[in-house]
Curated annotation (Swiss-Prot):
Keywords: Cytoplasm, tRNA processing
Gene name of the record: tusA
Name by which UniProt lists this protein: Sulfur carrier protein TusA
Subunit annotation: Interacts with IscS.
Localization per Swiss-Prot or TrEMBL: Cytoplasm
Any single GO BP term: tRNA wobble position uridine thiolation
Protein function: Sulfur carrier protein involved in sulfur trafficking in the cell. Part of a sulfur-relay system required for 2-thiolation during synthesis of 2-thiouridine of the modified wobble base 5-methylaminomethyl-2-thiouridine (mnm(5)s(2)U) in tRNA. Interacts with IscS and stimulates its cysteine desulfurase activity. Accepts an activated sulfur from IscS, which is then transferred to TusD, and thus determines the direction of sulfur flow from IscS to 2-thiouridine formation. Also appears to be involved in sulfur transfer for the biosynthesis of molybdopterin.
GO molecular function: sulfur carrier activity
One Pfam assignment: TusA
SUPFAM superfamilies the record matches: SirA-like (SSF64307)
Pathway annotation: tRNA modification
GO cellular component, as recorded: cytoplasm
Length: 81
């Protein structure tokens, strides 16, 4: 799974930010991306383990991978539309 994180199109460093800031930054970043591009999100807020997958489901983007066993958390999403 780690290989998926090695070459994202965009990276968002949300370390030190707390809910709702990380998901708001993800939304703003995704809005400026092209369909099919990937975004690596790096975060340390425990709420992101719920919020990032929920955002992807609600906005119908693809959550390609997530690592939440230890800090920092990493998520890889692909913009679907």
């Amino acid at each position: 799974m780690s290989d998926l994180f090695s070459s994202p199109d965009h990276t968002l460093d949300a370390l030190g930010l707390r809910c709702p800031e990380p998901v708001m930054m993800v939304r703003k970043t995704v809005r400026n991306m092209q369909t099919g591009e990937t975004l690596l999100i790096i975060a340390d807020d425990p709420a992101t383990t719920r919020d990032i997958p929920g955002f992807c489901t609600f906005m119908e983007h693809d959550l390609l991978a997530q690592e939440t066993e230890g800090l920092p958390y990493r998520y890889l999403l692909r913009k679907a539309h």
